[in-house]
Amino acid sequence: SLVKKKIIIALTILFVVISGGIYMYNKLTKPNLSPKTAKLYQHGFRLLEEQLGTYIKEHYSGVEKIEFSPIYVTEEGSTFSNAYVRPTIYDKYGNKATLGTKVNNVYPSSFGIVSHIILNFDGGGNEAIDLKDSNGNNIDVSNAQHLPEEAKLTRAKGIDWNIELLVEYGQLKDVIKDEKGSPNAEIVYNVNLSKGDE
């Protein structure tokens, strides 16, 4: 019947519009990485987030929670895109501030490829992941699911400076370098891939 036909046509149009919308949304928000590369980025950045989060949790008191941004991927089209993450620190007073974002006309760096992590595939096509230790040496963490002891940071000047700035300009309160750390701080990891904002 005509009504049935009209319904089918309307549903078809709706389907096309919705899938087109989802496709466009993904194209605009999700980076275009092959599944293998996406897996490498997610594995590597999960370890980097653990490295950064553990350092903040173990070396700063006054931290309620550390929450990571998605993995922002920029400069697509090359074999390896640039990518970075930004941790947000919550203090005990309900304030939160994100590392790697502008503080009073100063631009601290984000945490990403080359500066903090090296991602690649070896000759056999296996994941090759290096993190930097406290002295800036590369530590191979390719086979690790959790941060190995030798990749733990004992000092991290970039993080320290960034947190000092955030406290100085009142974005965070009473987040202090302290070897007692914040043992009860929660760390929220995020391995979603997203298009970068730079």
Predicted regions and their residues:
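Extracytoplasmic electrostatic interaction patches
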Residues: 103-198
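Homeobox/homeodomain signature
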Residues: 13, 18, 56-58, 137
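N-terminal Sec-pathway targeting helices
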Residues: 1-17, 26
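N-terminal export/targeting and maturation segments
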Residues: 22-93, 102-103
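Short, mixed charged/polar active-site loops
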Residues: 96
